[in-house]
Structures are given as C-alpha cells and as structure tokens.
C-alpha cells in the first residue's frame, strides 16, 4: 500500500477515535450541565411555591373560626374565590390581594378543602380539567389532558380557636410549569446548537493533533525505508564483485578439491539469493515511495499473460507441472506501468509453480466483468491454512519456510504483488484450502480503448 495513503488512513482513524471520545465526553458533560440546571430551576420553583403557600397559610389561619359555616366565612374572607356549587364571577383583583407580591399571578391557582377533603373554594384560573377529588400528597405534578403542566403544593390549615390543633382543612396552591418547560427547551436548543459546533472544533483539532502525533512515526518510517534502500544499494556492488570472483574461480581454476568446489557453489548460490533479496527490497522501497505515474501507459493484458505463460512454460515442464492459460476473447487493456504489472503476475505464477508438486496443474485466466479486468492464477498445490492467509502478503512471510529456502524464495514476492495491485487501484485476494491448492485473483480497472472505424 502507498505509504502516504497508509499514514493518512492511520491519521484519519486516530482523529476519528479522538473525536469520538471527546464527543462522548462533551455529550456526558452537556447532559450533566443540563440536568444540573433543570434540577436547580426545579428546586427554586418549589421553594417559591412553598414560600407563597406559607405566606397564605399564615395570613388565613388566624381568621378561620372553628364553629362558623365554612361557606359564609370564605365569602367574607376571600370574596374573589369561586365557591363550589355557586356562580363564579371573575374579579380582576382576585389573586392580587392574596398572593403577596407574586411577579406573575396568572401562573398560580388556589384551592381550599375542608378537613374531610371536600372542595370549598378555588381560583377561577385553575386548570379546567383539574379533578375536585382531594389528594393529600404534599407535592404533586399535575398533567392535564390539554394545556400546561402544574406543580401543586398541599398544606394543612388550622382554625384560630382550635386548641388541639386539629385540621380545619387544606390549602392547595399550584403553579404553571409552562415557563419552566419553555426554559428547559431553550437550554436544550442552545446545547443542541452548541454541540455540533463544539464537535466540529474537536474534529478539526483532532485532525491537527493526530498529524502532530503521526509526524515522528512517519519520519521514523521514512528513515527506516531510506536506510533499507541505502543498505541494499551499498550491498549490491560488493555482492556483485563477490559473485564475479566466485564464478571466475570456478571457471578458471578447476584443481580445487571437491569440498572446496562444493563450498564455492554454496557461496555462489547464497550470493545469488542475497542479490535477489536486495533487488526485491529496492523494488519494494521504490514502489512505496513513488507518488507519480510518469511511466504509465496503455497495457494489453492479453499480451502480458500470454508472454508470461510462454516464459514459465519451460520451468513448469521441468517441474512436471501442467501450465495453461485461458485468455478473454477480446483484448483487455489497463492503464499502468507495464513492467510492474508484468512483475505482479509473474510473482503469482512463480509462487504457484513453486508450491505445486509434480503432476499438478497451474491455470491462468483473463476475463473482464463490470469494467474490471480479472486475472486468476489457480494451482493444485499444497494450499494455505486459513490462519495463514491473512499474513501471506506481509514482508518475509513464508507458508512453508523449508521449501522456500530450498527454492530460493525471499518472502517478498506476494508483498510486492500486493503493493503493485494497490498502486494500480486494484485488489488482490486469495482463496485456498490445505491439500487442494490456491486461487489468487487480481482485479484491475479496465481502460476503454476507443474504436476507430476506417
């Protein structure tokens, strides 16, 4: 995979997780702040209602006689309240004389009950659907079928002449929660508007911080790649000299003992293997560092596969393996670097022959489907275990290490193939089963060639 794309994806993932974590923290913090504000407003509202109820209680209790008719007393004490089962005329000064400085008197209503829980009087502005059945709970939240919610407080009233402090009745005062609910909605709206802005700032900051975090890693990776390329480049010359010397000694002086000749042949073989490894490392490093497509041109995949089949035919015959190819009836073109595409397919064919036993088959096919060129290399070889299939495209990974050493494999062939495929905006997949062989599939975008009519 292209190095820049790899690090860009890692940076994006790091920024995403950072933004996700910070977004979760901001969400929890916002919910906590909202909950704290709502709770504070709720407690302030209850204190206000309780304070007003206490003031009314202290004002009414001294004027409540123990033996007078409740109806007659209430008509004299509270002429602006509506009595049960009597006509009610709304007086504009109704609550103003009895709510003692309430800022918005229309938000409140008052109800009086006798000690048996029978409704005696009520404010004309109480909710129309409010039940007349007495509920002795101190605090209640009233939910009328229509309209606003109310918070209701109930307290006991005692008559002035009652020495045993038995109950004369009950006072209920309720407050509309319309303003409270509207304030909560306003807070939610502010938080809902602020959250995307904050999340956007967090995402922007996350991207910058992820870049700062990835910079030393990227620099370290570049230094490692540069070191690998430099080391491989510096090793090529002395290694070439060593191989030339060994070949010259073997060719000119044949008087050595069999042991020395064997050692020289071993040195030559290992030197060539090391030379191939250096070549592969340089190629892999160059592929990962390339960012331009200057050498790309139109490539006929039919010719490429046909040439490779002919090239590997002799090797397959020597290994007693049946090598065949089945090309698409029409010409299939791709846009890319021809030498790299050649290396891509040749690595797969070489691997297939290497891991197929004598008497087996290697089949190469070229087809096209939905603007994609599909090249498959299928063998009847030893196969790949499921737990190894996800690692075979890693550098220096070998399925069968002993066999790779005997055949001179470097462990970079499939890694190079994967890098070339991704560089050409394609995909490389494998399907395999132990003892049944493997199927490698390359998919590359098709380059449509315009048809010129003569």
From Swiss-Prot:
**What EC number(s) are associated with this protein in UniProt?**
2.7.13.3
Mode of membrane association: Multi-pass membrane protein
First-tier enzyme category under EC: transferase
**SUPFAM superfamilies in alphabetical order:** ATPase domain of HSP90 chaperone/DNA topoisomerase II/histidine kinase, Homodimeric domain of signal transducing histidine kinase
Q: Would I find Transcription among this entry's keywords?
A: no
Recorded hits in Pfam families, A to Z, give: HATPase_c, HisKA
SMART domains given for it? HATPase_c, HisKA
Name the InterPro entries for this protein.
HATPase_C_sf, His_kinase_dom, HisK_dim/P_dom, HisK_dim/P_sf, RppB, Sensor_HK_Regulatory, Sig_transdc_His_kin-like_C
PANTHER family, alphabetized: HISTIDINE KINASE 1 (PTHR43711:SF1), TWO-COMPONENT HISTIDINE KINASE (PTHR43711)
From the Swiss-Prot or TrEMBL record, give the protein name.
Sensor histidine kinase RppB
Q: Which gene encodes it?
A: rppB
């Amino acid at each position: 995979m292209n190095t820049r794309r790899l690090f860009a994806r890692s940076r994006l993932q790091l920024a995403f997780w950072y933004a996700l974590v910070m977004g979760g923290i901001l969400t929890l913090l916002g919910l906590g702040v909202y909950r704290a504000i709502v709770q504070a407003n709720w407690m302030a509202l209850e204190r206000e209602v309780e304070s007003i109820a206490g003031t009314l209680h202290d004002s009414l209790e001294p004027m409540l006689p123990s033996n007078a008719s409740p109806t007659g007393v209430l008509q004299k004490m509270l002429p602006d309240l509506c009595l049960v089962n009597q006509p009610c005329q709304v007086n504009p000064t109704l609550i103003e004389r009895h709510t003692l400085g309430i800022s918005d008197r229309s938000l409140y209503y008052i109800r009086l009950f006798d000690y048996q829980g029978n409704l005696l009087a009520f404010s004309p502005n109480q909710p129309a659907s409010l039940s007349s059945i007495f509920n002795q709970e101190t605090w209640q939240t009233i939910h009328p079928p229509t309209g606003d919610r109310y918070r209701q407080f109930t307290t006991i009233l005692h008559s002035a002449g009652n020495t045993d402090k038995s109950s004369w009745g009950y006072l209920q005062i309720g407050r509309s929660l319309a303003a409270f609910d509207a304030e909560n909605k306003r807070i939610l709206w502010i938080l809902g508007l602020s959250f995307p802005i904050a999340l956007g700032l967090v995402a922007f900051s996350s991207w910058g911080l992820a870049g700062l975090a990835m910079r030393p890693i990227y620099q370290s990776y570049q230094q490692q790649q540069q070191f690998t390329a430099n080391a491989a480049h510096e090793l090529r010359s002395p290694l070439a000299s060593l191989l030339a010397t060994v070949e010259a000694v073997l060719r000119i002086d044949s008087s050595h003992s069999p042991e020395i000749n064997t050692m020289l042949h071993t040195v030559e073989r290992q030197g060539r293997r090391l030379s191939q490894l250096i070549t592969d490392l340089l190629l892999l490093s160059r592929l990962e560092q390339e960012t331009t497509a200057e050498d790309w041109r139109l490539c006929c995949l039919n010719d490429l596969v046909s040439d490779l089949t002919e090239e590997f035919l002799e090797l397959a015959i020597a290994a007693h393996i049946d090598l065949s190819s089945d090309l698409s009836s029409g010409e299939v073109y791709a846009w890319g670097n021809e030498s790299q595409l050649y290396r891509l397919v040749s690595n797969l064919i070489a691997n297939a022959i290497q891991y197929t036993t004598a008497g087996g088959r290697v089949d190469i096919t070229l087809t096209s489907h939905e603007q994609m060129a599909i090249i498959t290399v299928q063998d009847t070889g030893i196969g790949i275990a499921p737990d190894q299939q996800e690692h075979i495209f890693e550098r220096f990974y070998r399925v069968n290490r002993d066999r790779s050493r005997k055949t001179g494999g470097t462990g970079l062939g499939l890694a190079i193939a994967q890098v070339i495929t991704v560089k050409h905006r394609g995909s490389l997949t494998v399907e395999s089963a132990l003892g049944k062989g493997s199927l490698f599939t390359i998919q590359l975008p098709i380059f449509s060639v315009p048809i010129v009519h003569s």
